[in-house]
């Protein structure tokens, strides 16, 4: 997987289960939207305690790359979509995604990331992206209703809520 600028579908990835699901949704939508999928993640240096990171082998960019590769593996196993690229950028996640939405046809994000406010229906990054992105935004939610015993799970539920 090579790194390059975003074009077709940009997917915000933070390692959360919903960002992995966002990667899966992007693969489902790729042929209809057109263009390749770019899995994008953002990193920042910690604000406090920079002195404790004196090990020159460690860096937040390396952690971001590892997180992104793990999420891609979780989403696609050993068969990522053809043409999948990655984008690892320094800065706040919302800013990175909004900047890269300018060259995209669709931005896909999970409704909740790894932030600390679990009671919110929409996370701060997904809310800011939905408001400011330069392209349409698909916010992927977790299924809210579990299928009854013996019934198949409705894989199109997030798409229906997006299209409604």
Spans of features found by a protein language model:
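A non-catalytic structural micro-motif
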Residues: 83-87
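Short helix-capping segments at alpha-helix termini
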Residues: 75-81
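Small/aliphatic-rich secondary-structure junction motif
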Residues: 2-53, 100, 132, 143-145, ...
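Glycine-rich, Arg-bearing micro-motifs that act as flexible, cationic patches
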Residues: 106-132, 146-149
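A short acidic, glycine-rich active-site loop
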Residues: 56-67
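Charged docking surfaces used in two-component/phosphorelay signaling
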Residues: 88-95
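Active-site phosphate/pyrophosphate- and oxyanion-stabilizing loops and adjacent acidic/basic residues
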Residues: 73, 95, 127
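Structural motif
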Residues: 8, 105-106
């Amino acid at each position: 997987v090579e790194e390059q600028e975003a074009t077709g579908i940009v997917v915000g990835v933070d390692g959360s289960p919903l960002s992995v699901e966002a990667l899966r949704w992007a693969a489902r939508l790729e042929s209809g939207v057109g263009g390749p999928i770019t899995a994008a993640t953002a990193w920042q240096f910690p604000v406090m305690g920079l002195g404790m990171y004196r090990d020159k082998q460690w860096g937040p960019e390396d952690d971001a790359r590892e997180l992104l590769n793990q999420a891609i593996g979780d989403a696609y196993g050993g068969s990522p979509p053809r043409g999948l690229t990655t984008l690892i950028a320094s800065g706040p996640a919302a800013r990175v995604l909004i900047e890269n939405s300018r060259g995209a046809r669709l931005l896909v994000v999970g409704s909740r990331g790894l932030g600390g406010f679990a009671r919110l229906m929409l996370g701060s990054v997904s809310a800011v992206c939905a408001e400011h992105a330069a392209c349409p935004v698909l916010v992927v939610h977790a299924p809210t209703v579990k299928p009854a015993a013996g019934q198949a799970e409705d894989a199109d539920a997030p798409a229906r809520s997006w299209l409604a």
